[in-house]
């Protein structure tokens, strides 16, 4: 689990900085509030050394995910094959932590290109959830899925299925998905 201290200080990065990441890629910092994707990018790069069959990351990465889906679902994007994506989507509906597959078209990666670095850390005004995933895609070379859990990470009111406050979103989802994958492997 990647973690870091996030506070102002003399070594804090600033808009306009170019940072060399774990992977060796350089990132132009346009928005210092997009710090979560910077940490996650290094973690995804670090994971390459283990040659994973699949990596699924979850993060409360963007407010635009909340704007897109409200508190009723979470965006799913990635490079994993469609069958695996469908399996996790099926699990998400089974446990009522619904995922919606968002596209990760090449045009979104184009939005992340920088004139002074390999990539920039934000893509601009449009498709913030997708461009965040497009940024992360630069740091993987294995099957990968990204879940932006921001829409369901915090419940402002209780419902029949979820308590108020921290939701524990994705715990049931991963349990169901992995249970099904283990059952599939045992057959």
Where are these regions (language model features)?
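A generic structural signal for tightly packed, nonpolar segments enriched in small/aliphatic residues
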Residues: 1-187
């Amino acid at each position: 689990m990647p973690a870091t201290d996030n506070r102002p200080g003399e070594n804090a990065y600033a808009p306009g900085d170019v940072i060399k990441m774990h992977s060796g890629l350089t990132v132009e910092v346009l928005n210092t509030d997009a710090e979560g994707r910077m940490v996650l990018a290094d973690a995804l790069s670090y994971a390459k050394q283990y040659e994973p069959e699949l990596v699924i990351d979850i993060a409360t990465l963007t407010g635009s995910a909340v704007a897109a889906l409200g508190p009723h679902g979470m965006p799913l994007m990635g490079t994993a094959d469609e069958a695996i994506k469908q399996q996790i989507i099926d699990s998400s509906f089974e446990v009522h932590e619904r995922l919606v597959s968002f596209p990760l078209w090449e045009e979104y990666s184009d939005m992340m290109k920088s004139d002074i670095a390999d990539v920039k850390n934000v893509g601009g005004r449009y498709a913030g959830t997708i461009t965040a995933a497009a940024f992360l895609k630069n740091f993987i070379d294995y099957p990968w899925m990204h879940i932006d859990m921001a829409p369901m990470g915090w419940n402002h009111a209780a419902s029949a299925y979820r308590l108020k406050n921290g939701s524990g979103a994705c715990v049931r989802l991963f349990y169901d998905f992995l249970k099904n994958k283990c059952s599939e492997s045992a057959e």
